[in-house]
Amino acid sequence: MNPYILSIMLISLGLGTTLTFASSNWLLAWMGLEINTLAIIPLMANNHHPRAVEAATKYFITQAAAAALLLFSSLINAWQSGQWMIQDMSMPMSALMTIAIAIKLGVAPVHFWLPEVMQGIKLNTGLILATWQKLAPLALLYQISNNLMPELMIALGLMSTIVGGWGGLNQTQIRKIMAYSSIAHLGWIISIMHFMPSLAIINLIMYIIMTTTMFMIFNTLNSTTINALAINWSKFPALSAITMLALLSLGGLPPLSGFLPKWLILQELTNQNLALTATVMALSALLSLYFYLRLSYSLTTTIMPNTYQHMLNWNIKTKITFILPTMMIMTIAMLPISPSIISMF
């Protein structure tokens, strides 16, 4: 892609999200979401491959349907209340708005587009889709968190954690695994949004850090399938060992960073007399942990048979090397500073 066009698309992505963040009006928020959608579609179709074009088409149709539902619900709410303010939402329209935002996020049971779209695009674009594109819809949910239906949020969260874990079990494509991982993590964020929005923000920040780290690692290793991971131990032994810890952190194992948000969410759900919900979500996290362990096993304990012994490639010549160690440290070792993180919110 032409660098000037790429710059325009990236600036538009930032502009759309910023507009949604700063808006207190549903029309401006809707405009920001649409700018986001239109800006990422050329990045998706940049690959000039039928799968990339198919992914961009699926994404456009899904996001257009969600945007129409969001605009319809905000219009009905404005007709009933007489104003377009985001914070003033009546209960029926709040549920309809939640469903529209869930479609944009890829939350179960309206998640079917996300794995297919993720599989058809490059890892760099997949990183944007899995992290940056979640910010604007979640910002809207944060603003209407007091008017959300707790039963609907718990149902969406439970379904997402279960579907995210169950759907990733039989996958061999890393991009699809990361898509189901995204669905599962969004389930945790959605389930706590009504009860403690600040905790949802902490979970979102940790999710973005861990997911960014994993996409950067897979891009460095140039691996898109589980089988491709098996040859990386002989090429990048140090990176492979640290990647295993990052995967386990993504699964929420203590004492790694990913344990912090899950622990706090389970504690808050229990305080809200939702012990059964917390138990089901904790058990569904074991499903996700299985495919993280599967990736770790392929990466660190299997070596593809070959007759030629590769020289150990300890120096990774890549442009993102200076960013990757910082992201890895944050992914693995943020639990000791968790009291400081909690006090910030």
Curated annotation (Swiss-Prot):
Main location per the UniProt record: mitochondrion
Compartment(s): Mitochondrion inner membrane
GO biological process: mitochondrial electron transport, NADH to ubiquinone
Residue intervals passing through the bilayer: 3-23, 25-45, 59-79, 95-115, 148-168, 177-196, 201-223, 236-256, 273-293, 322-342
EC number of this enzyme: 7.1.1.2
Gene Ontology terms: cellular component: mitochondrial inner membrane
Its biological purpose: Core subunit of the mitochondrial membrane respiratory chain NADH dehydrogenase (Complex I) that is believed to belong to the minimal assembly required for catalysis. Complex I functions in the transfer of electrons from NADH to the respiratory chain. The immediate electron acceptor for the enzyme is believed to be ubiquinone.
Protein name: NADH-ubiquinone oxidoreductase chain 2
Species in which this protein is naturally found: Polypterus ornatipinnis (Ornate bichir)
Upper taxonomic lineage: Eukaryota, Metazoa, Chordata, Craniata, Vertebrata
